[in-house]
A protein has these predicted regions:
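Canonical Radical SAM [4Fe-4S] cluster-binding loop centered on the CxxxCxxC motif
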Residues: 52, 255-291, 601-619
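Flexible glycine/acidic-rich beta-alpha junction loops that bind and position SAM and/or redox cofactors
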Residues: 78-79, 154, 209-213, 320, ...
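N-terminal pre-triad scaffold of radical SAM enzymes
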Residues: 38-44, 62, 250-277, 301, ...
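Conserved SAM/AdoMet-binding glycine-rich loop
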Residues: 40-41, 299-406, 411-450, 454, ...
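Glycine-rich beta-alpha loop elements in corrinoid/cobalamin-binding modules
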Residues: 76-223, 463-511, 519-533
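Radical SAM enzyme core and accessory elements
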Residues: 1-27, 38-40, 487-620
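A short beta-strand-loop structural module common to alpha/beta enzyme folds
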Residues: 67-79
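N-terminal [4Fe-4S]-dependent radical SAM core
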Residues: 7-39, 46-47, 205, 211, ...
């Protein structure tokens, strides 16, 4: 039965299915018979959160333990947030409808820097104090994980526990310590955190002090408790085959942004694109066996009823058994009317065989990431793709009947000039011209080439962490020049808002002094900052000014190669020396080959205790 207040709220909002729960695949347990209750919170709408594969992995993993119960919570949309505040209805989980304060731990996934005010909004709706220092052992532990944990410093003061790296071993270990402490009784919050701090990859922000230089740079980050490491090394799953993919998703009531079956075929990437934070955070690359993936995929589609299967990873076409896997999947998928999609295909290893094996049921859209408009700039960012490869790939696609292609680029890249911006338009025009030059193209059909252009944001743990981000004026000038450089109605241009990218850049490289800014901006009405209709840029800028913080200090200045950064105490495997070496190669427009062809000494092999690949085998 729903609480009367909840029933009233649901009757007054759009899409009440976002908040009702009861979806197929949901896990229900007797809360009186479980020892640990964990609330997995996604700081965005239900539709966005239900697209997140990481939540599905950890939800199934924790709920395999009979005496643990993992439930879900999402950020309510504007109308529901207002109703919950009006009715004094605390934020609750989808399964039990219990408030977040009833849980032992409340975990947030940090997927995007612009979601930080939504975290505060969810804590506020739950009646939970923002700052860790204001919560004793009677409050739930507030836990964070995900890619933005690689520099969680702007929000570190809000969290009791931050997980660096991969959570499959880490999160169950945290829950086990919570269970042990509850059974012992009388364990203080500090004692529990000291125990949790011993788990590989766990960062307890309260156990570190940060000092600053007179010019505002970080001076030092030092542990303040005995036995706490000076640097925290990320957690990693050495063998992905030891963790089978989830085979029974919660199927959403309201259509998710990506409403399909999804299975992670590999983790990490061998390519070494210098702009790509994920490529460095998840090193080294590890893949699952084709036989395991085929069985899991078949079970997943049977259990959920989905008719589209996505083979997910940073670079799916680099899986060493991809052709074998596709052959196995095509033994059963067409019979079950299940289509296959490979969302991360690369221009340089796209083939007729791949396109034939993934279009037996229906065609999905084709998106290729060229990233930069000229070969010089592609060399700078180590995007080892040439025009000849782009031409070959588009030829294969057009001959297979495709008439629409999306090309993904970035602007604001290091060393970029207006000639590189013109190169984006020229590349798109060459693709249009290529289509009309092919004799096999569909008669009477036109072509549509979409340019999708993101603003480059330098990120920690990459070779470009040292570079300043373009100013908003520079980015707007480049966007204008791109539009003026496109002369064909066959080409459509989309680009990102530079103001949200600026805020993303500030938090990506920010430090603990930003926490009060985030709190104050939230109090002034900033949340859902990633949504164009909700973003209050002027409010953010006024908040920075009122608190005496210059946001440009964080993202629009060069970082010294020997400078202590807010993330210097976080070890994701790749050494600082390697990042500097790659940065210098970028300035010289020199490329680095994929690391499955030759080891370049990035340092990530120490996470596995040996070589990342068997270089005696032909891995190319």
């Amino acid at each position: 039965m729903f609480d009367p207040k909840l029933k009233e709220a649901l009757g007054r909002v759009q899409k009440p299915g976002r908040y009702t729960g009861g979806e197929p695949g949901s896990v229900y347990k007797d809360k009186e018979k479980v020892d640990v209750r964990f609330a997995f919170c996604f700081p965005d709408t239900y539709e966005v959160g239900m697209s997140f594969l990481g939540e599905k992995i950890l939800y199934e993993l924790l709920n395999r333990h009979e005496n643990w119960w993992c439930e879900r919570a999402f950020m309510p949309w504007l109308d529901m947030k207002a109703e919950m505040e009006r009715l004094d209805l605390p934020l609750y989980t989808m399964e039990s409808k219990d408030p977040l304060t009833a849980f032992d731990a409340v975990g947030f996934t940090l997927q995007y820097e612009i979601s930080y005010t939504n975290i505060l909004a969810m804590l506020d709706l739950a009646g939970i104090p923002f700052y860790s220092r204001d919560r004793d052992e009677h409050w739930p532990l507030i836990v964070a994980g995900g890619p933005c944990a690689c520099n969680a410093e702007p929000i570190a003061d809000f969290f009791d526990v931050v997980q660096l790296g991969e959570g499959e071993n880490q999160l169950p270990s945290i829950c086990a310590e919570i269970e042990k402490a509850k059974k012992e009784g009388g364990v203080s919050k500090k004692e529990l955190l000291l125990r949790i701090a011993k788990i590989p990859g766990v960062y307890i922000p309260a156990f570190y002090d940060v000092t600053y230089c007179e010019d505002g740079r970080v001076k030092a980050i030092t542990p303040n408790e005995p036995g706490i490491p000076a640097r925290i090394t990320k957690a990693i799953i050495k063998d992905l085959n030891e963790f089978a993919p989830p085979t029974n998703f919660v199927v959403p009531m309201v259509g998710a942004i990506q409403d399909r079956a999804s299975i992670e075929v590999l983790r990490g990437c061998v390519r070494g694109c210098r702009f790509c934070q994920a490529g460095f955070l998840y090193r080294p690359m590890r893949q699952r066996d084709a036989s395991l993936l085929n069985k899991a995929a078949q079970d997943l589609c049977a259990n959920t009823g989905y008719e589209e299967l996505s083979l997910s990873s940073l670079s799916t076409s680099d899986h060493g058994q991809l052709e074998e896997l596709l052959d196995d999947l095509n033994e059963w998928a067409p019979k079950e009317h299940v289509s296959l999609s490979l969302p991360s295909l690369r221009v340089d290893n796209f083939s007729e065989s791949l396109i034939e094996k993934t279009t037996k049921v229906r065609k999905s859209g084709l998106t290729f990431a060229a990233e930069a408009g000229t070969q010089r700039l592609r060399n700078v960012i180590n995007k080892n793709v040439t025009w000849d490869e782009i031409e070959k790939t588009c030829t294969i696609a057009f001959n297979a009947g495709y008439t629409a292609v999306k090309l993904y680029f970035m602007m604001g890249l290091p060393t970029e000039t207006m000639e590189d911006i013109e190169g984006i338009a020229e590349t798109a025009q060459k693709v249009v011209d290529l289509y009309y030059s092919l004799p096999k193209r569909g008669k009477g059909k036109g072509v549509q080439v979409t340019i999708s252009c993101a603003c480059f944001v330098p990120k920690p743990h990459t070779p470009f962490e040292f570079v300043p981000m373009d100013t908003e004026e520079m980015l707007r000038a480049k966007q204008k020049h791109l539009l003026e450089s496109v002369h064909s109605r066959k080409i459509k241009v989309n680009y990102h808002d530079s103001t949200t990218s600026f805020l993303e850049g500030v938090f990506a490289k920010g430090d603990r002094r930003l926490a009060p800014v985030i709190v104050e901006a939230y109090k002034r009405g900033c949340y859902f900052d990633g949504w164009e209709e909700c973003f209050k840029y002027d409010t953010w800028m006024q908040t920075f000014a009122d608190l005496g913080i210059d946001p440009a200090f964080y993202c629009q200045r060069a970082i010294g190669l020997d400078e202590v950064t807010p993330w210097s105490h976080m070890d994701y495997g790749v050494t600082h020396e390697y990042l500097v070496r790659e940065y210098n190669k970028a300035l010289a427009a020199q490329t680095t080959q994929p690391c499955n062809r030759a080891c370049h000494g990035c340092g990530a092999n120490h996470l596995l205790g040996g070589p990342c690949f068997d270089y005696s085998q032909n891995l190319v």
